[in-house]
Structure formats: C-alpha cells, structure tokens
C-alpha cells in the first residue's frame, strides 16, 4: 500500500492460512475463523506480537502447524493487494458448547514465543572476540526460526561469557539470551515480520530514522480526529543529588535547574529531586576531585532527566508501518504536529482495518 491508495476507499476481506512448521509453506486455508478479532503489537513485551481470534469448532487437534493472517484489499481503480498481518502459534484450550455448535477463543502468539519457551539444556559458552549478533542469530536458527539478512555488526565481546545460567527468564530462556546479546551490541530486541521471520536491527534514535509514514489533516486524511495528546511532565526532576559512598566515606554532588526553563525550580515553584547512589569510588582521586566528579555526574543526570514523554494515541486506517517505525503527524486543527516512534498497535480485523496506535517521543528541555 502506498500513500495514494491509502487515501482511497477500499474493500477488505480476511483469510487465515495454515502454515507447515516443517516447510514454512502455506498448505491451505484454515476455515472456521469467525469475523472480527484483533492483532496486537507491543515493543515493550518480549514476544512483541499476539492475536485474539474466534474459531467455529474445536482447535485442540490443530497440531504443530502455524497460522498466518492475511488482509486482501481491493481499490476502485482495480488495484488489489494481499497484505500479511502476522504469523502465529494458535492456542485454544477452552471450547464453548451450545448443543451441536461450539466456538473456541483462540489466543495466538508470535513466533518469538518459541524462543521464550525454550531453555538451554546446557550452558552456552561464547568466546571472547565473538560477534554477539551472529550468536543471537544462530540461537534463533537452532529453534527452527528463519532470520532475515541483517547489517554487519562491528562489536566484539571483550571477554568470554556463559549464557543459559540463572533462574530468571532473561538468564535461562533462549529469547532472554538473544536479547541480552543484542543489547550488548547496541541493537534492539528481536522482532518478527508478518511472515514470522526474525528481524535483527541496530538501535537508532528516532531522530536518526527516516519517516516511515505521514498522517496529514485534509481531504486525504485517514485518521480519526479524536485522539489523546499527552505529556508526562509532572515528575520531571529539577534537582539531582549524586552520592558516591562506601563504608568509610561519602561524597555528594548536587545539580539544580534554576533556569527560566519550563521544569526549573523557578518555573515550578518547588523542588523535585532525584537521588542516585554509587559505590564504585576511584581510589586515586583527592576529596576535592571526588566531590567535583559527583557534581559533574549530577549535572549529567540532570540533563538526561529533563525529558518528557510526548505520547500520542490515535486511530487510523491501516498503513504499512509497525512498532519502532517513525511517523509524522500534521493535525493543525488539533494543534498536534511532530515526529513520533510507534510503541504499540492494535489491528482490528473488521471493515476498514482500523488500527489503534500509540506513538511517543522524548522531548528534552
């Protein structure tokens, strides 16, 4: 879908296909899925994607295959397009029975669930000098997932490390290991594309990313005029206290924003503090140098703390964008204008294929 067709009316139908886990190929239509349902994407959850559908019948004997949801769109100019919306593991443990009829709510999980369900039978040793992204990709492939081509990663591990030890999910599951390796390299957590393939990408600030889609008020607008425009500014600190301490000594640094800025002590009329404590005190510095270091750290943290989450929640007609993508919103009537990175999406599998989107941007004063 391009920007031109996005402004045109369209008809949409949905189909759910059965996908062989062995070959990755679609083997036929999975009939019986009732109209409606949702697909959710959330970059703050480990498996990112999920879906809720309803099936006419019993899905308990579905087997190991996957399902893939498609939207088939047709425009008045005769153009048509089939858009994959997600590939999932279906689960329907509970069936509602009414005489000979029955329906099953189907909870669907993105394919990263296969990594989160898998633990290491033996700890995995990663030698010093390894490419952590290559190791992460190898772990994904070992559980049967396809990994899309990714950029070269220049980072190398400085020392050997062992994965798969510990009791928490981030330490024991293969998804936890993959995301730890990606974080080490400065990459975003693993995600999947609508075909169920794993996508590995380096992290880039929204200001460094190209705009994926533009929403503009006017005749071609395809977003609802009612939206939520929110800024979380109330708790932004205007004083930071930095404490370096061990059992014998304590060195305190303080930074205060008393400028004319919107979050300063002068503008707010009160002090809003944040305190950070550190125990790693350098041994080769004088008391004056340590106090100066604490003051410098407090000043650095004060600058970093002066950020406000500008959050935009709105509904729009489907566009080919996903979590992490940067969008522009130009809505003069509502006094909303800016660039935002998508955090969550909920796709409604109904007429119009509407999407509830939350996007945000960190504003620094």
Task: Enumerate the language-model features and the residues they cover.
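Acidic, small/polar-enriched beta strand-loop surface segments
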Residues: 1-24, 179, 183, 188, ...
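Beta-strand-rich assembly/attachment modules of structural machines
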Residues: 1-131
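Hydrophobic beta-strand residues in large extracellular and virion-surface proteins
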Residues: 12-16, 51-53, 67-71, 90, ...
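Intrinsic-disorder/low-complexity loop/linker signature
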Residues: 23-24, 46, 77-79, 152, ...
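Oligomerization/assembly interface segments of phage tail-like spikes and tubes
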Residues: 40-58, 102-114, 242, 276, ...
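Short intrinsically disordered coil segments
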Residues: 67-70, 121-127, 215-220, 257-259, ...
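Charged- and aromatic-enriched interaction segments used to assemble
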Residues: 100-231
């Amino acid at each position: 879908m391009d920007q031109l067709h996005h402004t045109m009316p369209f008809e949409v139908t949905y189909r759910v296909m059965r996908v062989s886990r062995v070959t990755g190929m679609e083997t036929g239509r999975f009939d019986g899925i009732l109209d409606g349902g949702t697909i959710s994407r959330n970059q703050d959850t480990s498996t990112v994607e999920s879906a809720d559908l309803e099936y006419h019948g019993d899905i308990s004997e579905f087997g190991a295959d996957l399902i893939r949801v498609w939207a088939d769109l047709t425009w008045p100019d005769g153009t048509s397009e089939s858009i994959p919306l997600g590939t999932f593991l279906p689960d329907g443990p509970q069936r509602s029975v009414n005489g000979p009829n029955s329906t099953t709510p189907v909870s669907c999980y993105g394919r990263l669930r296969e990594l989160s369900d898998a633990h290491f039978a033996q700890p995995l040793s990663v030698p010093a000098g390894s490419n952590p992204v290559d190791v992460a990709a190898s772990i994904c492939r070992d559980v049967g997932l396809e990994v899309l081509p990714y950029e070269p990663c220049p980072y190398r591990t400085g020392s050997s490390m062992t994965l798969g030890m510990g009791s928490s999910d981030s330490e024991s599951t293969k998804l936890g290991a993959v995301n730890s390796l990606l974080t080490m390299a400065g990459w975003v957590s693993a995600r999947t594309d609508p075909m169920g393939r794993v996508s590995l990408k380096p992290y880039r600030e929204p200001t460094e990313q190209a705009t994926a889609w533009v929403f503009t008020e006017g005749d071609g607008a395809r977003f609802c005029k009612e939206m939520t425009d929110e800024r979380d500014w109330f708790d932004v600190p205007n004083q930071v206290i930095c404490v370096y301490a061990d059992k014998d000594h304590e060195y305190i640094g303080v930074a205060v924003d008393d400028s004319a800025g919107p979050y300063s002590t002068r503008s707010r009329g009160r002090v809003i503090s944040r305190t950070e404590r550190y125990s790693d005190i350098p041994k080769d510095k004088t008391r004056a140098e340590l106090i100066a270091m604490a003051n410098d750290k407090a000043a650095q943290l004060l600058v970093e703390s002066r950020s406000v989450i500008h959050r935009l929640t709105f509904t729009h007609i489907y566009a080919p964008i996903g979590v992490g993508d940067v969008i522009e919103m130009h809505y003069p009537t509502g006094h909303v204008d800016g660039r935002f990175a998508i955090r969550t999406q909920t796709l409604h599998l109904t007429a119009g294929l509407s999407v509830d989107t939350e996007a945000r941007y960190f504003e620094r004063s």
